[in-house]
Regions:
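Exposed, low-structure sequence patches enriched in small/polar residues
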Residues: 1-324
Length: 324
């Protein structure tokens, strides 16, 4: 197989909007000397992170009163694109394309005690779901059931058990809404504090991915935001070698066969739970059960919906020009 070309592009865009910044902006790189440079050369050259807001607060640079309600905002967009052009034999060309886009926005309410944060964003990446592409979607007689959907339902118990095993041996946190709670600092007990629900998003999303992409539910990642290692390419295949056959060349000026497959996994607009408390390892954590007030295992994010969009354009195409 001959690799003709490989192109890798990665972009990272970070931004910060800090409302309520008190010092005046200076003339040189936007700096004003107030005992130290404000807001600092790091801010001027875009080399600031979340800690800058804490430093600005400690130095009294932020306006904090009942009229200030606009949070500081930190935006981040990561975009990875990988393209490759292959030509295994003369006339057969394969174009591979893989893409992963992760966009996040964090609102930091620095004017409130504890500086609560809320994160939102979106996520999309290319993947392959051929295993369920031709399985059908059922009909009214069988309740529109399908093999992929039946697998999705069955995979929930496997994913839930994996999550339960992950929480097993941990202790409940003592911060956030868990401060002063009777379970704070005690070993995790699903019978007391609530276990992993089969219908929670942290169960449904991995079960959905395993069912529709053909992955083993015992091995599929548990995150709703798969890492770069899970990135799979889409492709376009063309072949124009048939025109070299004499009988075809006799009647056609050109002939090209084509096939294209596109598939992407997307997480729609999501936000973080304001009351989520980190359990201290591997992204484990809890949210407060509205009815009981007890901790319920949960990911940090409130995800409304995920989707897999798949298509062939075309599944098989012929583009020919006659000799006339």
């Amino acid at each position: 197989m001959m690799v003709r070309r490989v192109n890798i592009q990665y972009s990272l865009i970070d931004g910060m909007m800090l409302s309520g910044y008190a010092p005046e902006v200076g003339d040189m790189f936007g700096q004003r000397r107030t005992g130290t440079l404000a807001p600092g050369l790091g801010f001027a050259f875009g080399a600031v992170r979340r800690s800058f807001i804490d430093e600005a607060d400690e130095r009294g640079w932020l306006v904090k009163n009942e009229n200030m309600t606009t949070p500081a905002m930190i935006n981040s967009a990561k975009n990875l694109t990988i393209r490759a052009n292959l030509e295994p034999i003369a006339g057969l060309k394969i174009d591979l394309n893989a893409n992963r886009v992760d966009t996040r926005s964090t609102d930091i309410y620095y004017m409130q005690d504890g500086m609560p944060e809320q994160m939102g964003g979106s996520f999309t990446m290319t993947t392959i779901a051929l295993g369920s592409a031709f399985g059908g979607s059922g009909n009214a007689n069988n309740g529109y059931s399908s093999k992929a959907f039946d697998k999705f339902i069955a995979h929930r118990s496997v994913i839930a058990q994996r999550l339960m095993d992950t929480y097993s041996g941990t202790v409940y946190p003592s911060s956030g809404f868990m401060a002063g709670h009777a379970l704070a600092g005690k070993p995790y007990d699903p019978a007391v504090g609530g276990g992993v629900s089969l219908n929670s998003m942290e169960v449904l999303v991995p079960a959905f991915l395993a069912a529709y992409t053909g992955k083993d539910p015992n091995k599929v990642g548990l995150s709703a935001f798969p890492s770069v290692k899970s990135l799979l390419p889409n492709w376009r295949v063309t072949y124009d070698g048939l025109i070299r056959i004499p009988v075809i060349r006799k009647y056609f000026k050109s002939m090209m066969l084509s096939h294209q497959y596109r598939c992407s996994y997307s997480v729609g607009a999501f936000s973080s739970f304001l009351d989520w408390v980190d359990a201290g390892q591997d992204g484990l954590g809890y949210i407060r059960d509205i009815q009981t007030g007890n901790p319920t295992p949960s990911s940090p994010y409130d995800i409304a919906a995920v989707s897999i969009t798949e298509g062939f354009s075309p599944l098989f195409g012929v583009d020919a020009t006659l000799l006339n």
